[in-house]
Curated annotation (Swiss-Prot):
Gene3D superfamilies (alphabetical): 1.10.287.3510
Protein name in UniProt: NAD(P)H-quinone oxidoreductase subunit 4L, chloroplastic
Enzyme class of the recorded protein, top EC level: translocase
Gene: ndhE
Keyword line: Chloroplast, Membrane, NAD, NADP, Plastid, Plastoquinone, Quinone, Thylakoid, Translocase, Transmembrane, Transmembrane helix, Transport
Entry's family note: Belongs to the complex I subunit 4L family.
Documented EC number(s): 7.1.1.-
Membrane topology per record: Multi-pass membrane protein
Pfam name, any one: Oxidored_q2
A Gene Ontology cellular-component term: NADH dehydrogenase complex
Quaternary state and interactors: NDH is composed of at least 16 different subunits, 5 of which are encoded in the nucleus.
GO molecular function: oxidoreductase activity, acting on NAD(P)H, quinone or similar compound as acceptor; quinone binding
GO biological process: ATP synthesis coupled electron transport; photosynthesis, light reaction
Claim: rRNA-binding is one of the keywords in the record: no
Length: 101
C-alpha cells in the first residue's frame, strides 16, 4: 500500500476516535474511542517502521507494547465502569461524581 493512503486512513481513524472521545457522554463509548485512537497510533508505528527501515522491528515491537498497555487499560477501565454502574446505575460521564467528594 502507498504510504500516503495508510497515513490518511490512520488520520481518519485518529480523528474519529478523538471526536468520539470529546463528544461521548457514555464511559464505554469513550473507552472504545480511546482504543480507536491507540489503533490509529499503532497503524502509524507499523507503517513508518515498514516504510523507513525494513530490517529492524522497532515500530512493530513498540506496537505490541502499546497493544499490551491498551489491553490492560481496557480491562481496568471496564472494571471501573462496572463498579460505577453497580453503585450509580448509570454509565454517563457527567453523572459519575465519585471523585468530587
Amino acid at each position: 500500500m502507498i504510504l500516503e493512503h495508510v497515513l490518511v486512513l490512520s488520520a481518519y481513524l485518529f480523528l474519529i476516535g478523538l471526536y468520539g472521545l470529546i463528544m461521548s457522554r457514555n464511559m464505554v463509548r469513550a473507552l472504545m474511542c480511546l482504543e480507536l485512537i491507540l489503533n490509529a497510533v499503532n497503524m502509524n508505528f507499523v507503517t513508518f517502521s515498514d516504510f523507513f527501515d525494513n530490517s529492524q522491528l522497532k515500530g512493530d515491537i513498540f506496537c505490541i507494547f502499546v497493544i499490551a498497555i491498551a489491553a490492560a487499560e481496557a480491562a481496568i477501565g471496564l472494571a471501573i465502569v462496572s463498579s460505577i454502574y453497580r453503585n450509580r446505575k448509570s454509565t454517563r460521564i457527567n453523572q459519575s461524581t465519585l471523585l468530587n467528594k
